[in-house]
């Protein structure tokens, strides 16, 4: 699918950076570096105009069902180095962080309160979603915003999937793919 150029109004647009954490980025290997750089470019543009930025952080505790029920190896443990944001995309003081314990950045999180605090409104504002894991967490974020009546977009240069065959096909069915950052 060809990208769509969309002009963004920083006052009515939020940048959501999903799961750009050490552990996940290491799993994706060197191919993630251009994605990190492209997200950083968007982040710098939003920061330069005092834009609305939300960092989403996936964290777990040792009693999480992923480990206790499904037997997965421990990962993204709260407070562990792997759960930290990658250095290039670390939040600055005052930038919002939403911690989540599932693929969904809305389920049992502060996302709704953060959107209200930033005065981002459904049926009016656009959300630009970036990150890795487009077949999981980015996908669920886009769907979460979509079902809440936000216009959600994924810059095709600023997300990727662990299973490359899923990138970007899963998101293109639901949202416009931006060809430019802003």
Question: Model-derived features: where do they sit?
Answer:
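Short glycine-enriched, charge-decorated loop/helix-capping segments at active-site entrances
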Residues: 28-34, 70-76
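Active-site-adjacent betaalpha module
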Residues: 1-14, 41-48, 74-182
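Short acidic, Gly/Ser-rich segments with clustered Asp/Glu that frequently serve as metal-coordination loops
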Residues: 21-27
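Generic enzyme active-site microenvironment
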Residues: 17, 21, 55, 155
